[in-house]
Amino acid sequence: LRNMDYSTIYDEIEKNHNYNVKLPDGGIIQLMYRFNRTGTELISHRLGYYPSPSYELYQNDPELYDVDYIYGDILNKSVLPVIIRADYNRDPEESELHHPYSHITLGGYKNCRIPVDRPISPMKFVKFIMEHFYYVPSSQLEFNFEIEGIVAFEEHIAEKDINKSRIIV
């Protein structure tokens, strides 16, 4: 899906059902993890948030969204939809030579890889999206955040990324 316009990327993900959650406004959340054969070690993850490239749902039923402050920013015409991806690969040969083991990419910018100090759990990623893109305070999310501590990953950051601006999970 490289070098394609955003709506084509979104349509391919949607058409192939390559996502875990489709939000009421059409936004898509993708959570993909790969573990070793015994399921005890994380090998890689690819987490993504793809905002809807169209406001067709809103145009067909604006009252549905107007009453809900959660969608205020999402439906603002001056807001540009931005893909958020969080990738992790424990393989030092692939990761250290080209990019940090764990990083966040904003938009489709090839060289935008913001180092993250460790892999990101599904709960933390979904919470991040809901709090920062939908204005849903965690106190209003109906998740059991106590289980958030069950899935915790060890710090895994390359020496050369420690002095860079980075995100600490």
Segments (PLM) and residue ranges:
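Short N-terminal edge-element motif at the start of the domain
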Residues: 1-42
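Detector for Asparagine
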Residues: 3, 16-20, 36, 60, ...
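An exposed acidic His-Trp-rich patch
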Residues: 37-121
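Long, compositionally biased interface segments
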Residues: 113-169
